[in-house]
């Protein structure tokens, strides 16, 4: 579709939240590094997950698809040193997780991708390559990274405020090296929730890492991943769209969510409650957010950057002023998300000012409607769809198919809840 045309309406009903993309990436990787057969169930085959599957297959994992399950055997992982090409598509997780994994043994690998992926930072790895004499070459702006060599265990100093994905990539890799290792975090660590997901998944697959208060991680070498069966839980970063719609007056029951989850994006519940919405636990793994008298607040984007676009929609329709702070990393996602959500919501009638590392949002009673652009970013497209539920006139979203990156069934689910739309 080139565009979707949405007639404003409240959403109502129950929706099965897609499985967590973050946890699926991690489970596929750990299973692929295990010597034996694992079954990973409840998989949503988004573009990012397919990229990780294909990447691990390129490195030697045997992966079979059976409906929503993956049967994975890592017996032959990294057995040969033949030249390999790994297409990351637009998945930053695939790229940053698999780069160090590909260097567990001597290897030659070409990482390619598309979209904005070539513009996303990789300097953390380049510094490690130079220290360890791993050969590498890359093209500015485009993702065409060639690496040759292998990693050795030891001490790794990593900034914590660029992307937690670098740390996760090393956490997956270092237990399989001969030497013991230490990761030292040299700045304040952002997105701790994603590190928790990585550590939890690694532990489930039988690997031990000591976490010293997120300042350093101590990793014994010569460990091995153990195969297991694992079901992926529902994704709070996707539930955040429906929670936000609920806060704005829709009535949506979200299924397949674990309230004890380690997912950092679960923070959306606390933020929305702080703004005046109310959480309802309907039954086991079933949650709703109910509309309340919404007021502006301060939202720290450093620990939950992925849910900031849709929370900006809620803030735009809340009383008073909301400030998004510590959000500079949103500029290096699939698009510049601070600029994109500010620009597009203002087209719909919001009052948002863009800052270097955040936003100032002055609430309005309602949005008007109009034509907006997704910036080919899945989270911007879905956020604008939620904004349409509080518009007076129809909303036209250009380039809506980008939702396939993380949530291929979004538009069907939106319609099943009473959303009125047509694609062109």
Curated annotation (Swiss-Prot):
Gene3D superfamilies according to UniProt: Enolpyruvate transferase domain
Keywords for this protein: Amino-acid biosynthesis, Aromatic amino acid biosynthesis, Cytoplasm, Transferase
SUPFAM superfamilies for this protein: EPT/RTPC-like
Disulfide bonds: none
NCBIfam families xrefs: aroA (TIGR01356)
Molecular-function GO terms, alphabetical: 3-phosphoshikimate 1-carboxyvinyltransferase activity
Residues reported in the UniProt entry to bind 3-phosphoshikimate: 21-22, 26, 163-165, 191, 306, 333
Keyword Amino-acid biosynthesis: yes
Reactions catalysed, as given in the entry: 3-phosphoshikimate + phosphoenolpyruvate = 5-O-(1-carboxyvinyl)-3-phosphoshikimate + phosphate
Pathway terms, separated by semicolons: Metabolic intermediate biosynthesis; chorismate biosynthesis; chorismate from D-erythrose 4-phosphate and phosphoenolpyruvate: step 6/7
Protein name per UniProt: 3-phosphoshikimate 1-carboxyvinyltransferase
